[in-house]
């Protein structure tokens, strides 16, 4: 559970910004989207491999550029 305590003389905007940062770092939304539907382990592994290949290709292209 992500929570934020208000500091002295802190505006709501700054508090909201701190909350959003903590929320993103905690990975709440990412985990929610991942658990929204079931993926077979074989499909999940296949997707992870393909994402890794794409990431490696991009890194390789950046090194060569």
From Swiss-Prot:
GO MF, one annotated term: structural constituent of ribosome
Pfam families registered for this protein in UniProt: Ribosomal_S21
UniProt keyword list: Ribonucleoprotein, Ribosomal protein
Entry's Gene Ontology BP terms: translation
GO cellular component annotations of the record: ribonucleoprotein complex; ribosome
Region of interest (Disordered), residue spans: 43-65
Listed Basic residues bias regions: 48-57
Keyword Kinase (UniProt): no
Matches recorded under InterPro entries: Ribosomal_bS21, Ribosomal_bS21_sf
Family: Belongs to the bacterial ribosomal protein bS21 family.
Entry protein name: Small ribosomal subunit protein bS21
Taxonomic lineage of the native organism: Bacteria, Pseudomonadati, Chlorobiota, Chlorobiia, Chlorobiales
Name of the encoding gene: rpsU
